[in-house]
């Protein structure tokens, strides 16, 4: 008679600490950025307080229980990290609330039976950027499964992901915005009146994307068709925004376990060495592969400007009914701050602004992450 033995999985935690599943990767074109963020979070979660489980999602959507080694989720020789089916053990998270928090094996062989509960978790940290993660999809799954999770709920995640509806909610609250036009899938280009209203230059973006993927700066209308086609490689809905001449500022927002909300110091992004180039902007390569971005934290702005930015950041957070955390991006113009966008799950990579903003606000990285987890547990799940 063969006796079943669980395969050796040394990364599975034990003990009485809060068990956190860091979920990363995913089907969006921000897969690699999510992996980088997860590596940074895995490195900085306080292991005295938390047991940590790493769950990677492949680009095809397969969930894998992986080794929570942050070194495996780093850029190596300019190669971005990714989750593969060889990364660990295939699993699922059941939506049945009677099995809340269970990670269930889907694998066969090597002594492992499909349907076996690999481990159970107390809270999920969904470090997913872009569609199929940051847009309310995984938040809906976790609500069905009654598993607490870090970050915004279904509505705020969906609204924050879609630039059109973010802007509509901000406009309803009277927040300062730039001019824009939305091109839905059946609209090939702008009307003449829209071109006149926006004027050049404009930025053409996927409406539901991040990390500056798929974005083009258009300085002549002849460039518009190719810019729209490029954006539509990532999203059939495209947004065209009037360029704003101003400094790029960012501010972090953090919800505490008691429900109060705080804003961080203000930071500024400058693209090094290309300040005289009209076509330069803070794109994906600048953010993650090249050392071309300079981050001033805190930003060199007057106190009254910083206070206004922090106040607007909290207003933006509340305008979409956000929870947990967010980063709000601004342009500082001669007439004051203009909101660019809100990120309901900002980047946590080694170069990301969000943890840097809180570090200069006297909240170190482990404390920042612990606050997010504590807030998720205090909030729970369900209508609130």
UniProtKB/Swiss-Prot annotation:
Note on cofactor: Binds 2 magnesium or manganese ions per subunit.
Record carries keyword Lipoprotein: no
Pfam families: Dala_Dala_lig_C, Dala_Dala_lig_N
Residues that bind Mg(2+) 2: 341, 343
Species of origin: Mycobacterium leprae (strain TN)
Recorded metabolic or biological pathway in which this protein acts: Cell wall biogenesis; peptidoglycan biosynthesis
The protein's name in its UniProt record: D-alanine--D-alanine ligase
The reaction(s) this protein catalyses: 2 D-alanine + ATP = D-alanyl-D-alanine + ADP + phosphate + H(+)
Annotated positions binding Mg(2+) 1: 329, 341
């Amino acid at each position: 008679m063969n006796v079943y033995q669980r395969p050796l999985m040394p990364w599975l935690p034990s003990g009485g600490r809060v068990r956190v599943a860091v979920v990363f990767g995913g089907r969006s074109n921000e897969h690699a950025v999510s992996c980088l963020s997860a590596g940074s979070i895995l490195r900085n979660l306080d292991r005295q307080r938390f047991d940590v489980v790493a769950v990677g999602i492949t680009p095809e959507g397969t969930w894998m229980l992986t080794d929570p080694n942050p070194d495996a989720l780093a850029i190596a020789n300019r190669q971005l990290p990714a989750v593969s089916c060889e990364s660990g053990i295939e699993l699922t998270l059941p939506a049945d609330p009677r099995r809340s928090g269970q990670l269930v094996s889907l694998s066969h062989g090597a002594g492992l039976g499909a349907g076996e509960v690999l481990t159970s978790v107390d809270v999920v940290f969904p470090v997913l950027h872009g569609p199929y993660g940051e847009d309310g999809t995984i938040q809906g799954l976790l609500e069905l499964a009654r598993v607490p999770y870090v970050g915004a709920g279904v509505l705020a995640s969906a609204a924050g992901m879609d630039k059109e509806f973010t802007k509509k909610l901000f406009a309803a609250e009277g927040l300062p915005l730039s001019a824009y036009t939305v091109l839905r899938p059946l609209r090939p280009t702008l009307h003449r009146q829209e071109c006149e209203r926006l004027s050049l230059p404009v930025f053409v973006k996927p409406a539901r994307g991040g990390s500056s993927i798929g974005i083009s700066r258009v300085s002549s209308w002849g460039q518009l068709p190719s810019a729209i086609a490029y954006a539509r490689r990532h999203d059939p809905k495209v947004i065209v925004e009037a360029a704003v001449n101003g400094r790029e500022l960012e501010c972090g927002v953090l919800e505490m376990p008691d429900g109060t909300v705080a804003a961080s110091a203000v930071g500024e992004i400058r693209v090094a060495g290309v300040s005289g180039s009209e076509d330069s902007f803070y794109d994906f390569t600048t953010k993650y592969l090249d050392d071309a971005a300079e981050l001033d934290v805190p930003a060199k702005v007057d106190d009254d400007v910083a206070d206004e930015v922090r106040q607007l950041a909290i207003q933006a957070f509340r305008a979409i009914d956000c929870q947990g955390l967010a980063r709000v991006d601004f342009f500082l113009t001669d007439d004051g701050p203009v909101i660019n966008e809100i990120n309901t799950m900002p980047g946590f990579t080694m170069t990301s602004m969000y943890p840097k903003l809180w570090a200069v606000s006297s909240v170190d990285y482990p404390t920042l992450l612990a606050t997010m987890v504590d807030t998720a547990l205090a909030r729970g799940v369900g209508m609130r």
